[in-house]
């Protein structure tokens, strides 16, 4: 959704410049070939004869010079699952220990600081090869000049979805750009040095290994983060974490006794077990094995005496440890039984589960609180949704949190009964299904999403995962359909014809597979409202159109009617005489960040054109939501939650990229936002 210098236009590219061999052409012509002139630039929603112009594009990724340094600033949003650098385990050691596994939403500026790409050289978010909420799979290219910069590409030609606008990269022939060692991006690294985090944008186009790769497990630790230093070459004692606590304590106490006994003979080597931190002592066990000087020199008689005493102490320690372990195990069983009984009688805590697995469910206090928001109303036919942290391959190191998805679903179920996803990577679909099950949302339905890319590896992986999800489902009635690609034609740039051929091929492949497996699900795609044509409609089982009045520079007083008129004149006629479903796949309004005056029109003041703000959002909601509910219009609202990381796409005067949510990233309804209750009427 949105991007740098985004506008609603049929003529210019994303840099707002015409090329030397181009001239401005408006597609809105009268019967006499005269050009329309409207208050919204080139766009007239009443003109049925509009024909979209081909969109220019520049190819490829750029790369970062290998000597480029990285700047690190990061904090965590209060109330989130993450631990920040101020907490024990923050920073690189925390990442090495998996602290980021439960990463929740970072604040916008800090999320941006985790990327090592200057804002001025970032492509717009809707570049074909960028990661956005509707593209959590393919990363943004870093700075460099191995490939042409997408900044040279022109303004977008139309409104968009929830990724930023930018140059379209090639879609033709399912090709993957080749690379040479000099073209390798630092983003391809699986660790990315000390700046790696769950919000970094990595390249998915190369599997090369780099000398800059840093394995956090290999970094020397000075212990100042509160965790004990694990010695090189030492056996990993962390696997013993599940040993009953009393048994471990008994063993540590025995080791401490041995250490004190040796001290009587003035031995200098440290005890292999004695430490105030049991974990640290265990971790250092093998350090003492490098030189076994427990008895040392002296008379043989004294050696025998010491040996006999030590043998007796060791036997006593073994017996004591065994007894302690048995008693501890019995006590542990008793505590577990008592805890289970208490849990079953009084419910679980805010972070607990009645299943005892640490995962939230409908009986968790936190979930009960989230599902009891009187300011939310189930009036949206559908909501676009991308779980947090599902960028591949980064999610392999920092998996998204099931509890975060469950929290999101607890909120979303108060807004809608239908959710749309954009891809299958990183188990996002499985986590949504798990959340639906844990919350027992029997009325919730899901539109499956598949991300289509020029990189055939990405596309094949996504489609393969789609097949697994559907075939492994106990009941496919929860699925409403499969959306193969989002705005693949727009991102194809001028090579739209080849892109359309490839896209139709993917759609047909999925349809054939479902037919062979006796799976009855509609298959189609979603794209800009003016990118649909008869050929694509013929291949798809439904038509999904992304329509955003904000980027047309439409004033808020006209936004609702403009959206309806545009949809009715551009898209619904394509399915006349068929039973194919028509759906607006994205529509919304930002809550702040400036104003947009449409194609080729620079706003003269901050009140002109489409103004982002809470009041404007409320007006659009009040004039669109209940009316659509009454007339049965099918649409997906973009979007429920802010995405702070998209602050990197903001530009002066156009700072709305991270502000499209009804709620902030912590799932709090934004102050002043009023979701209509439509007189108590809800989506069925």
Swiss-Prot record:
Location relative to the cell: Cell membrane
Transmembrane segments: 303-323
Regions of this protein lying in the Extracellular compartment: 324-684
Comp. bias regions, Basic and acidic residues: 12-32
UniProt keyword list: Carbohydrate metabolism, Cell membrane, Cell wall biogenesis/degradation, Glycoprotein, Hydrolase, Membrane, Polysaccharide degradation, Signal-anchor, Transmembrane, Transmembrane helix
Region (Disordered): 1-38, 124-143, 157-182, 330-358
Top-level taxonomic group: Eukaryota
Biased composition (Low complexity): 336-347
Cytoplasmic side of membrane: 1-302
Glycan attachment residues as annotated in the record: 404, 427, 455, 474, 631
This protein's name: Putative glucan endo-1,3-beta-glucosidase btgC
């Amino acid at each position: 959704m949105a991007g740098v210098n985004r506008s609603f236009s049929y003529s210019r590219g994303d840099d707002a410049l015409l090329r030397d061999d181009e001239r401005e052409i408006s597609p809105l012509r009268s019967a006499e070939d005269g050009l329309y002139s409207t208050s919204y630039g080139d766009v007239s929603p009443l003109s049925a004869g509009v024909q979209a112009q081909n969109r220019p594009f520049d190819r490829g990724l750029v790369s970062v010079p290998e000597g480029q340094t990285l700047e690190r600033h990061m904090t965590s949003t209060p109330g989130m699952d993450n631990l920040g650098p101020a907490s024990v385990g923050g920073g690189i050691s925390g990442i090495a220990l998996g602290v980021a596994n439960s990463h929740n939403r970072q604040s916008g500026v800090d999320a941006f600081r985790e990327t090592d790409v200057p804002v001025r050289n970032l492509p717009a978010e809707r570049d074909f090869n960028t990661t956005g909420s509707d593209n959590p799979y393919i990363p943004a290219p870093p700075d460099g000049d191995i490939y042409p910069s997408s900044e040279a590409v022109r303004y977008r030609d139309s409104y968009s979805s929830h990724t930023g606008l930018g140059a379209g990269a090639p879609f033709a022939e399912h090709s993957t750009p080749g690379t040479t060692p000099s073209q390798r991006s630092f983003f391809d690294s699986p660790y990315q040095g000390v700046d790696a985090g769950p919000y970094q944008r990595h390249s998915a186009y190369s599997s090369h290994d780099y000398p800059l790769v840093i394995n956090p497990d290999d970094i020397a630790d000075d212990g100042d983060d509160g965790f004990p230093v694990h010695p090189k070459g030492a056996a990993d004692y962390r696997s013993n974490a599940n040993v009953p606590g009393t048994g471990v304590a008994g063993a540590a106490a025995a080791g401490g006794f041995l250490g004190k006994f040796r001290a009587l003979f003035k031995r200098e080597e440290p005890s292999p077990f004695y430490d105030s931190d049991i974990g640290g002592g265990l971790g250092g066990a093998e350090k003492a094995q490098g030189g076994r000087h427990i008895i040392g020199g002296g008379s043989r008689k004294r050696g025998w005496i010491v040996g006999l005493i030590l043998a007796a102490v060791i036997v006593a320690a073994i017996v004591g440890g065994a007894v302690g372990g048995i008693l501890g195990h019995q006590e542990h069983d008793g505590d577990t039984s008592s805890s289970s009984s208490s849990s079953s009688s009084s419910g679980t805590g805010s972070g607990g589960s009645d299943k005892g697995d640490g995962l939230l469910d409908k009986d968790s206090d936190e979930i009960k609180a989230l599902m009891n928001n009187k300011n939310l109303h189930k009036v949206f036919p559908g909501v676009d949704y991308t779980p947090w942290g599902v960028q591949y391959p980064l999610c392999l190191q920092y998996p998204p949190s099931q509890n975060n998805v469950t929290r999101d679903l607890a909120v979303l179920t108060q807004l809608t009964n239908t959710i749309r996803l954009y891809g299958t990577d990183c188990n996002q679909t499985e986590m949504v299904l798990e959340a639906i099950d844990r919350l027992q949302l029997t009325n919730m339905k899901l539109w499956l999403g598949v991300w289509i890319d020029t990189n055939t590896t990405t596309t094949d992986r996504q489609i393969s995962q789609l097949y697994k999800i559907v075939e492994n489902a106990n009941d496919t009635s929860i699925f409403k359909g499969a959306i193969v690609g989002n705005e693949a034609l727009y991102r194809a740039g001028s090579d739209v014809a080849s892109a359309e051929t490839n896209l139709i091929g993917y759609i047909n492949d999925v349809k054939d597979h479902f037919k062979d497996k006796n799976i009855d699900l509609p298959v189609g795609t979603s794209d800009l409202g003016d990118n649909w044509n008869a050929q694509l409609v013929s291949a798809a089982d439904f038509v999904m159109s992304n329509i955003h009045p904000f980027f047309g520079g439409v004033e808020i007083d006209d936004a609702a009617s403009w959206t309806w008129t545009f949809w009715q004149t551009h898209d619904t006629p394509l399915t006349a005489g068929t039973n194919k479903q028509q759906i607006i796949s994205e529509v919304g309004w930002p809550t702040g960040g400036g104003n947009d005056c449409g194609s080729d029109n620079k706003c003269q003041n901050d009140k002109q054109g489409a103004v982002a703000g809470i009041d404007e959002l409320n007006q659009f909601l009040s004039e669109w939501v209940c009316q659509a509910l009454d007339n049965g219009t099918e649409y997906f609202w973009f979007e429920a939650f802010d995405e702070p990381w998209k602050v990197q796409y903001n530009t002066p005067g156009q700072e709305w990229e991270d502000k499209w949510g009804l709620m902030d990233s912590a799932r709090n309804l934004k102050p002043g936002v009023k979701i209509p209750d439509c007189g108590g009427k809800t989506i069925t």
